[in-house]
A protein has these predicted regions:
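The feature marks helicase ATPase cores and/or their adjacent C-terminal helical subdomains
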Residues: 1-511
Length: 511
């Protein structure tokens, strides 16, 4: 789909391959230039995620001229919609409440019990993002399609949205739309709810267009069909043609949800405003590797680009798998001996089936992007120090509290309130026995694994058992004091990050 726009409102496309400073250099410079000309009141800077929005907002607020603007400084919420996600800007001024995962999700599940799937930490944490129905609904909306058309034109919807079929999806959709507008039985008030899809649609239906001096859109190539309509609407009243789409068609990763690389490839030829050429992130090896993939795309659309690497040479290694590939020992040794950072990234959750076993088999500490270490050092130390504690070594007050966190109830004679009563000092096992906090019979149980809480649910118990084996491996491989330098996350999470070493799963893709 190519959107038709009047000549005055055509976006100026600022193009830059990976790591060329599109966001943190060019956007800041352009924003400052526009601020000096128009002031900040009607300059709108949009991105796709809250994380990106917050980073941009922080960077703008740290500009010296912004710090000295008394109007901005007197209002802590000044940038709330002026630097925003596309959804949040579209919601501005709306009178509907946003569908809430804490209150509305449980109520919806009561209305449609088949929404409740096998217990999933991801779905519990954010059903709007991870539940198969909401994924399907959002991706269909992003493509500008009804669910039935989206389903019938997707590569493998049964796998993407399992365990549901099309009939289930259509039924849930009907219940969901009814739910958003029905009365809440608890309050007898009409719910009047909206989700992210509704925010965009309501904005696009509004007959009036916003008054904007300038519009800048970061990572514009990831915009969906309805988002592009919204951006076109926002751009109608800008001054002096100040509409800037900043991005790179070759980095489009949301085609399954409506982003359109073909539209942006053509726009990069017809509406090119600025091309950033100097690479600030990728080594020579990575630059060459990426060019081998994207140069044919440049040629297909009849253009070429300059994209220079950094001065770092770098290396690219081929690892067909993480079991017995040539060069695997080199990777393992490097993780063990260097202080460099390592990022494992993948396309789908299925890739974790080979990444996580590899890390845990080798006793490497790791964390999922944006989260704490998968198994905390405090928990690992409980298993390591417990036998020493039983043999008479003193343990710190903090370590004793950590024991109490993990011990089963029947293995403690008192609950954690004891730590508010006793002195903050080191204690021996015998001292805690004499104080009446632990039973002396525990002295024969040197294996802390035998004493910890065990989940009742079978699936969680299996994960618990794997966790215990992993902790043993860390201790047995003498990796106790190893600092966690390993992270893993999918392609969408890692975009824009810089790490010393990146291990990429190329085996699974999504059309």
């Amino acid at each position: 789909m190519i959107l038709k726009q009047t000549k005055l409102n055509q976006p100026r496309f600022v193009i830059g391959p990976p790591g060329t400073g599109k966001t943190h250099i060019w956007i800041l410079q352009k924003y400052l230039e526009l601020y000096r000309k128009y002031g900040a009141d009607k300059i709108i800077l949009l991105s796709h995620t809250k994380v990106a929005k917050n980073e941009l907002k922080k960077a703008i607020q740290e500009l010296e001229e912004i710090k000295n603007d008394s109007v901005i400084q007197e209002n802590e919420n000044y940038f709330d919609y002026r630097i925003s996600t596309i959804h949040a800007y579209c919601k501005k001024g709306g009178n509907k409440s946003v569908f809430d995962k804490k209150d509305d999700w449980p109520a919806l599940c009561q209305a449609a019990p088949f929404l409740l799937l096998k217990k999933s930490a991801q779905i519990t944490k954010d059903p709007m993002k991870y539940h198969p129905f909401f994924k399907c609904n959002s991706e269909a909306h992003g493509r500008g399609m009804k669910i039935i058309d989206h389903w019938n034109s997707s590569v493998d919807p049964h796998e993407s949205y399992k365990p549901y079929n099309l009939k289930h999806m259509l039924r849930i959709k009907q219940i969901y739309e009814d739910f958003k507008n029905k009365r809440d039985t608890r309050t007898n008030l009409k719910r009047n709810l909206q989700d992210y899809c509704d925010m965009i649609d309501a904005f696009n239906r509004n007959p009036s267009d916003p008054e904007i001096d300038a519009l800048i859109v970061d990572e514009a190539q990831d915009s969906s069909v309805p988002q592009l309509r919204a951006l076109e609407k926002m751009a109608r009243n800008v001054k002096d043609g100040n509409v800037y789409y900043v991005g790179d068609p070759n980095q489009t990763i949301f085609t399954f949800a409506g982003s359109n690389p073909d539209y942006f490839e053509k726009l990069s030829v017809t509406n090119k405003y600025k091309e950033l050429e100097t690479g600030l992130r990728c080594s020579v090896a990575i630059n060459n590797y990426c060019k081998a993939i994207i140069v044919p795309v440049w040629r297909q659309y009849g253009y070429t680009r300059t994209w220079t690497p950094t001065e770092i040479e770098g290396n690219v290694y081929n690892l067909p798998n993480l079991i017995g590939s040539p060069g695997l020992n080199e990777l393992i040794d490097k993780i063990k001996t260097s202080k460099e950072s390592f990022l494992f990234t993948y396309r789908t959750e299925a890739s974790k089936n080979w990444i996580i076993p590899f890390l845990e088999k080798n006793g490497f500490k790791y964390s999922h992007l944006g989260n704490n270490q998968h198994v905390s050092d405090a928990e690992i130390n409980c298993h390591y120090t417990w036998p020493l504690f039983l043999k008479g070594e003193t343990q710190s007050f903090d370590q004793l509290q950590s024991y109490w966190t993990h011990l089963k109830k029947e293995n403690k004679l008192k609950d954690s309130r004891i730590f508010k009563k006793i002195r903050k000092k080191d204690y021996t096992f015998q001292e805690f026995v004499n104080l009446g906090y632990l039973d002396e019979s525990l002295k024969d149980k040197e294996d802390f694994y035998q004493l910890v809480k065990i989940p009742k649910e079978e699936e969680r118990r299996k994960k618990h058992d794997q966790r215990m084996i992993y902790i043993k491996t860390i201790i047995n491989k003498y990796n106790l004091n190893q600092k966690s330098t390993i992270e893993l996350g999918n392609f969408h999470q890692v975009k824009g990050l810089t790490r010393d070493n990146v291990i990429v799963d190329l085996t699974l893709t999504r059309a």
